[in-house]
């Protein structure tokens, strides 16, 4: 395997028009890997820390020139000449160099950009697609998408408290068919919303952001769209929610301001249970606050037999927090976001840890994305079975679906679509 010969970084824009880091790693053979780093809007308090410049006169303080300098300076000095195939050693070298528990000194955005680009360069060196390089001969499962078609919360400017309302085409036979089904429902929903007098502007992740007043109303529109597209809700297409409950958790209570409700953890459990009785909800993410461990355990013991309970802000792709959650039976699934932990090797460790504990893993985008489709390869490499990467609009979201379609075509008969195997209960 070739050694790392050069690393260059640059400041580019993400899908929200904010700066982010892009990194090129060049090996002495000429092989190259390029990676662009995503960024979140609703971020957990325990996530790895992005390094921003903090200069108000430039990008409103959000510039990433300091992270770029860290990549081309300290990080290159530390890992230049290392074997690109030694992913764990390279990642650990960067972690040690940073010296903080949350990668705050050099920036998780700097470290992650290098980590992903190193893996891509190593794959390029031996002529393998990234999913095959990372996952080996067993990388073959095409994930069921979670497609965000209605946005609320921090992802939209409307009264809906819940952040994401998603569809999962569990009845599809392939990823290509799943994408088609999702697109047809998305277009049907657009017409139904328009005919009902709602705007059809889209939010950060490509879903519609209509001025609806409640989760029940949003789920009702989704059901109508599924049926209008010629499918059966609950049979062909199931629903998933991302509550992002930390965003409306204050003083020990959950404030659903759009619906005029103030609930405790038990009340939130009952609230979701009631929605699940009326609609085919098979997965709910972050139904409680990121540090409400007791509430999470109660929620999962109550509803986890029938639905997937996904920890995002709870776990922040961190193996240490995940181990605590496994011991406490806080959730039965983890959302995997590469920039929450900041290196590829730690990301893969979290997936493996969850799977060994009998949990599912959902590979996820962030609200601030780029055309980089690395997470599609990671989803297949880990046989995760599920991917969350936004709506059927905006090229930064569609790029991941298109990459999955390419991978499916390349795998041919060796590939399998996860489909109904993700269902619980």
UniProtKB/Swiss-Prot annotation:
GO molecular function: magnesium ion binding; phosphopyruvate hydratase activity
GO biological process: glycolytic process
Details of cofactor binding: Binds a second Mg(2+) ion via substrate during catalysis.
Annotated catalytic residues: 205 (proton donor), 337 (proton acceptor)
SS bond partners: none
Pathway stated in the Swiss-Prot or TrEMBL entry: Carbohydrate degradation; glycolysis; pyruvate from D-glyceraldehyde 3-phosphate: step 4/5
Any single GO CC term annotated in Swiss-Prot or TrEMBL for this entry: extracellular region
Principal cellular location given in the protein's record: cytoplasm
InterPro entries in UniProt: Enolase, Enolase-like_C_sf, Enolase-like_N, Enolase_C, Enolase_CS, Enolase_N
Catalytic EC class: lyase
Substrates-to-products reaction catalysed: (2R)-2-phosphoglycerate = phosphoenolpyruvate + H2O
Record localization: Cytoplasm; Secreted; Cell surface
Enzyme nomenclature, EC number: 4.2.1.11
Residues that, per the record, bind Mg(2+): 242, 285, 312
Keywords: Cytoplasm, Glycolysis, Lyase, Magnesium, Metal-binding, Secreted
Cofactors required: Mg(2+)
Binding-site list for (2R)-2-phosphoglycerate: 163, 337, 366-367, 388
PANTHER family: ENOLASE
Family statement drawn from the similarity comment of this UniProt entry: Belongs to the enolase family.
Function (record text): Catalyzes the reversible conversion of 2-phosphoglycerate (2-PG) into phosphoenolpyruvate (PEP). It is essential for the degradation of carbohydrates via glycolysis.
Name of the featured protein: Enolase
Species per Swiss-Prot/TrEMBL record: Acidiphilium cryptum (strain JF-5)
């Amino acid at each position: 395997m070739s050694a790392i010969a050069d690393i260059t970084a640059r400041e580019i824009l993400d899908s929200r028009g904010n700066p982010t880091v892009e990194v090129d790693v060049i090996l002495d053979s000429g092989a190259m890997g390029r990676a662009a780093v995503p960024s979140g809007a609703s971020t957990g308090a325990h996530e790895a820390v992005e390094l921003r410049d903090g200069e108000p006169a430039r990008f409103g303080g959000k510039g990433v020139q300091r992270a770029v300098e860290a990549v081309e300076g300290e990080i290159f000095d530390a890992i230049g000449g290392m074997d690109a195939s030694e992913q764990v050693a390279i990642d650990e070298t960067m972690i040690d160099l940073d010296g903080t528990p949350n990668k705050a000194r050099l920036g998780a955005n700097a470290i992650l950009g290098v980590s992903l680009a190193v893996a891509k360069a190593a794959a390029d060196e031996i002529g393998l697609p990234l999913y095959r390089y990372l996952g080996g001969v067993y990388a073959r499962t095409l994930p069921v998408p979670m497609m965000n078609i209605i946005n609320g919360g921090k992802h939209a400017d409307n009264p809906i408290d819940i952040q994401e309302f998603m569809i999962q085409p569990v009845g599809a036979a392939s990823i290509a068919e799943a994408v088609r089904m999702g697109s047809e429902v998305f277009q049907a929903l657009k017409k139904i919303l328009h005919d009902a007098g709602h705007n059809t502007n889209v939010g950060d992740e490509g879903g519609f952001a209509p001025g609806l007043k409640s989760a029940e109303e949003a789920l009702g529109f989704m059901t109508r769209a599924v049926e209008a597209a010629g499918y059966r809700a609950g049979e062909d297409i199931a629903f998933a929610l991302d509550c992002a409950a930390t965003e409306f958790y204050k003083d020990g209570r959950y404030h659903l301001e759009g619906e005029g409700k103030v609930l405790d953890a038990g009340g939130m459990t009952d609230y979701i249970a009631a929605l699940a009785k009326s609609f085919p909800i098979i997965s709910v993410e972050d139904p409680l606050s990121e540090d409400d461990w007791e509430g999470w355990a109660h929620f999962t013991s109550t509803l986890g037999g029938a639905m997937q309970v996904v920890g995002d802000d709870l776990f922040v792709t961190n193996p240490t927090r995940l181990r605590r959650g496994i011991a406490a039976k806080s959730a039965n699934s983890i959302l995997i976001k590469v920039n929450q932990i900041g290196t590829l090797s730690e990301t893969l460790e979290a997936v493996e840890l969850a799977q060994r504990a009998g949990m599912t893993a959902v590979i996820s985008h962030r609200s601030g994305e780029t055309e980089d489709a690395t997470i599609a390869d990671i989803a297949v490499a880990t046989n995760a079975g599920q991917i969350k990467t936004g709506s059927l609009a905006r090229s930064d979201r569609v790029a991941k679906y298109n990459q999955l379609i390419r991978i499916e075509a390349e795998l041919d008969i060796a590939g399998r679509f996860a489909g109904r195997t993700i269902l619980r209960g």
